[in-house]
Amino acid sequence: MFETLQEKTEEKAMVQFLERFTDYPFLVKFKNSEYHIGEGEPTFTVNFKKVIPLADLMKSTSLALGEAYMRGDLDIEGNLYEALDHFLGQMGKFSTNESALKKIMFSSTSRKNQEKEVTSHYDIGNDFYKLWLDETMSYSCGYFIHEDDTLYQAQVNKVDYILKKLHLKEGMSLLDIGCGWGFLLIEAAKKYKIHGTGITLSHEQYAEFQRRIKEQGLEDYLTVELMDYRDLPKKEYQFDRVVSVGMLEHVGRDNYQLFLDCVEKVLKPGGLFLLHFISALKEHPGDPWVKKYIFPGGTVPSLREILNHMAEDNFHTLDIENLRLHYNKTLLHWEKNFRDNIEKEKTMFDEEFLRMWDLYLSACAATFHNGIIDLHQILMTKGVNNDLPMTRWY
């Protein structure tokens, strides 16, 4: 009887906590009871198989709810993305005790630790990523020119768009920092006959990119290296163009200036640099659940802080573009592909991992849709370049 009474007390405390999220009405179900939160017809239902202690919700709302979902103690009845889209728009009401989460929220930005963090995500296995990415193996925001563009077409569009922005000419040298599986450099070599170098910390990406270079006979045009961006100045490289797509988020707030310093040292005077990154309106340490399970050490920079750092290296801004809704659509494609291949994925990973990954893709799509995060491309020059067209050429 005492246990039942205690459970009921914890249940009511939990419901009282959830009553702060009233922007969209929803149902909360427990084993023997249900509660209607907000006014109007419920837009989704959260089914709790176990009560989450109030202390856990107060310490980190996202961690408590995210881990409950991973364990199967929490289920969403209906469409996961739609529920998250309603709920995550209210992330400002989440509780986060940063001092109690120091190890998760503020991990070391040392070389050794960052290499470990990057490989923990990107070295899960190429076979896994091939199941839900498109044929290009692009793990970044696509660019949907037409409403009915496929994911593959959107990724081709994105790379074409970036290469046009870089104003490439035959024989130029191009560095890709965080080159992934190499699609951008392969396209640049084929279409513009540039000489490209890609650097990555991921052994899986390195091996696959090397295989692709040989497969397509591009050994005279492309090289890939396992390298930390901090080692670039030591190599005495000089490039006409530099690009970095979806890598800045791994650099860490303490290293933004160092990252840009390294780019400045290897970019020729007047050279173009395109920086493509997830951003936020304001500086924030990040989400505890994402930092613990998906991107350890990852931090989303604000647009304004990157612009401030750029000035220190005499980078002149040519253009800034926001592709937020393109990333929302990209993630929804990934999430659908992930679900369509769930039977194959079950042979690779356990249920908890698969629930975690599904939650990650759906939650990220929802945060982009709600403008909690953005996707920016900044096109800049090292110093002044008066030889470029006066109007946009892309």
Go through each PLM region and give its residues.
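Conserved SAM-binding loop of SAM-dependent methyltransferases across substrates and taxa
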Residues: 181-192
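A short acidic, Gly/Pro-enriched loop at the edge of an enzyme's catalytic core
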Residues: 230-242
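A short glycine-rich, Lys/Arg-flanked "PGG" loop and its adjoining helix->strand segment in the class I
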Residues: 257-269
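Conserved beta-strand signature within the Rossmann-like core of class I S-adenosyl-L-methionine
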Residues: 270-278
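Substrate-binding/catalytic lobe of Class I Rossmann-like enzymes that use SAM or dcSAM, i.e.
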Residues: 278-388, 392-394
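Conserved SAM-binding strand-loop segment of SAM-dependent methyltransferases
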Residues: 217-230
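Feature captures hydrophobic
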Residues: 1-155, 161
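Conserved class I S-adenosyl-L-methionine
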Residues: 170-178
